[in-house]
């Protein structure tokens, strides 16, 4: 991946807004992913999910970790080792969910940035989200 392009763009991302929307959309578009978040409360409708304070807070937490990972593009497996262990060994998250979240994140970035999120930038982010998803699923291999 083009580190300079990725980090330069990422500095413009409002992690709290994008994270909240990405996680919310994941839960709405792929409702089976809600099983890990049932304790958050009412997730019975798209509006309930998108307005849920716990979903928003966890979405920010997810993207804060993603931001940290961008500082280690040469060692994503190392950067996400402890989160891989948590999500795989303790929470038993389906590794496919990491790929789905990456796909949703790309959609949200395109929505927020429009023409600025051009095909070249999208291609770079597709590589990054695939790398992060692979790193998070590493404990399954």
UniProtKB/Swiss-Prot annotation:
CDD domains: Hb-beta-like. Keywords: Heme, Iron, Metal-binding, Oxygen transport, Transport. Residues 1-141 form the Globin domain. It comes from Ammotragus lervia (Barbary sheep). One of its GO terms (cellular component) is blood microparticle. It comes from the Eukaryota. This is Hemoglobin subunit beta-C(NA). The lineage of its organism: Eukaryota, Metazoa, Chordata, Craniata, Vertebrata. Red blood cells. Pfam families: Globin. Transmembrane segments: none annotated. SUPFAM superfamilies: Globin-like.
């Amino acid at each position: 991946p083009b580190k300079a392009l990725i980090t330069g763009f990422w500095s413009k991302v409002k992690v709290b807004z994008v994270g909240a929307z990405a996680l919310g959309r994941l839960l709405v578009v792929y409702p089976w992913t809600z099983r890990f978040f049932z304790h958050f409360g009412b997730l019975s409708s798209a509006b309930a999910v998108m307005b849920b304070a716990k979903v928003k807070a966890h979405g920010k937490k997810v993207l804060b970790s993603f931001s940290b990972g961008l500082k280690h593009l040469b060692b994503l497996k190392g950067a996400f080792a402890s989160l891989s262990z948590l999500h795989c060994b303790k929470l038993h998250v389906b590794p496919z969910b990491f790929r789905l979240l990456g796909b949703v994140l790309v959609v949200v970035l395109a929505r927020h940035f429009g023409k600025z999120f051009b095909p070249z930038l999208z291609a770079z982010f597709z590589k990054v989200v695939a790398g992060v998803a692979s790193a998070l699923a590493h404990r399954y291999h």
